[in-house]
Curated annotation (Swiss-Prot):
SS bond partners: none
Source organism (scientific name): Mycobacterium avium (strain 104)
Keywords associated with the record: Amino-acid biosynthesis, Arginine biosynthesis, Cytoplasm, DNA-binding, Repressor, Transcription, Transcription regulation
Organismal lineage: Bacteria, Bacillati, Actinomycetota, Actinomycetes, Mycobacteriales
Task of the protein: Regulates arginine biosynthesis genes.
Main subcellular localisation: cytoplasm
Protein name stated in the entry: Arginine repressor
NCBIfam families: argR_whole, PRK03341.1
Transcription regulation listed as a keyword: yes
Keyword Amino-acid biosynthesis listed: yes
Family the entry assigns: Belongs to the ArgR family.
Example of a GO biological process term: L-arginine biosynthetic process
């Protein structure tokens, strides 16, 4: 079989790895912008393929706390980051981009996000495996974060705000 393409074909896994790397390091606002960044690396992709890749990777387009144009983000791979140098760096970045406000009650920190972003932020908090967090529950724009005793919800809210 002869190929008519001039550039070598990239495997789906390699292409998706590059997509994750790009979305982790740059604020990409559209599929066409992502396609251009991939093309700069010699990876040509159709819009349909890119759309499938983003869906398979679980990428979501979230608006920041300022309500501006959304950017694509890919959820973490599920491995905890506790004990890793700079393990909270990603959580800090997400908190600075998505945290609208923080409040507390008893042992709960109540975090407000732009609509649609709470689940993504809760997942990042869970995956950061912070020793003072028991777990999270997320709605559309609100995350309940349970503090581990003896920390209070107010102390937890303050700690999370300081990560921004």
């Amino acid at each position: 079989m002869t190929r008519s393409k001039s550039a070598p074909e990239t495997t789906r896994a390699a292409r998706q790895a590059r997509i994750v790397a790009i979305l982790s390091s740059a604020q990409v606002r559209s599929q066409s912008e992502l396609a251009a960044l991939l093309a700069d690396e010699g990876i040509e992709v159709t819009q349909a393929t890119l759309s499938r890749d983003l869906e398979e990777l679980g990428a979501v387009k979230l608006r920041g706390a300022d309500g501006g144009v959304g950017v694509y983000m890919v959820p973490e791979d599920g491995s905890p980051v506790r004990g890793v140098s700079g393990g909270t760096a990603r959580l800090s970045r997400l908190l600075s981009e998505l945290l609208v406000s923080a409040d507390a009650s008893a042992n709960l920190a109540v975090l407000r996000t732009p609509p649609g972003a709470a689940d993504y932020l809760a997942s990042a908090i869970d995956r950061a495996a912070l020793p003072y967090v028991v777990g999270t529950i997320a709605g559309d724009d609100t995350v309940f974060v349970a503090a581990r005793d003896p920390m209070t919800g107010a102390e937890l809210a303050d700690t999370l705000e300081k990560l921004t």
